[in-house]
């Protein structure tokens, strides 16, 4: 958050949006994330390092630890917890308690800047189109990977190519 904004700006925004029943996505860490969980965001997306830091640990490297931490975040209010794991893919604990794991496609890391945001965008596009968490995760992993494999953010063609190569469940 820029220094010119109050520390509770996310809370102020979510308080205003709450009556509209808006689905909110939060990609924040630490206290910012903790303070907005009470608003029951539709999706939060920490990476495995941020998730470990949130609980006072190092990076969470295995699925069991990630899922246990994701469950704690759900118990605090998050509806869906999407955890990006870089080359190890992603883990999603959905609001129905189902666990989804996707492997990352093969490719050469060129630039990881924006890959997490691309994953969120792909996930949301997939979910809004299909209402299916598995397909949303597949598109999210494809979009995040396609961005990581490019100098710039991925194009639709880049993402489609990754999907054709296959983004698979773990």
Model-inferred region functions:
Residues 1-64:
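Conserved beta-alpha-beta core of the PfkB/ribokinase-like small-molecule kinase fold
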Residues 16-19, 34-35, 63-170:
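Conserved phosphate-binding/catalytic region of the ribokinase-like
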């Amino acid at each position: 958050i820029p220094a010119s904004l109050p520390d509770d700006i996310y809370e102020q925004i979510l308080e205003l949006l709450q009556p509209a029943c808006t689905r909110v996505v939060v990609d924040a860490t630490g206290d910012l994330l903790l303070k907005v969980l009470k608003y029951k965001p539709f999706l939060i997306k920490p990476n495995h390092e941020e998730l470990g830091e949130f609980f006072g640990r190092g990076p969470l490297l295995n699925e069991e630890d990630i899922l246990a931490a994701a469950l704690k975040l759900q118990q605090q209010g998050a509806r869906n917890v999407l955890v990006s794991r870089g080359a190890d893919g992603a883990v999603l604990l959905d609001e129905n308690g189902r666990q989804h794991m996707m492997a990352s496609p093969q490719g050469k890391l060129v630039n990881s800047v924006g890959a997490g945001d691309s994953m969120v965008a792909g996930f949301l596009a997939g979910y809004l189109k299909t209402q299916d968490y598995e397909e949303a995760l597949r598109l999210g992993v494809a979009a995040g990977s396609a961005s990581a494999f490019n100098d710039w953010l991925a194009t639709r063609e880049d993402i489609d190519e990754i999907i054709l190569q296959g983004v698979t469940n773990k």
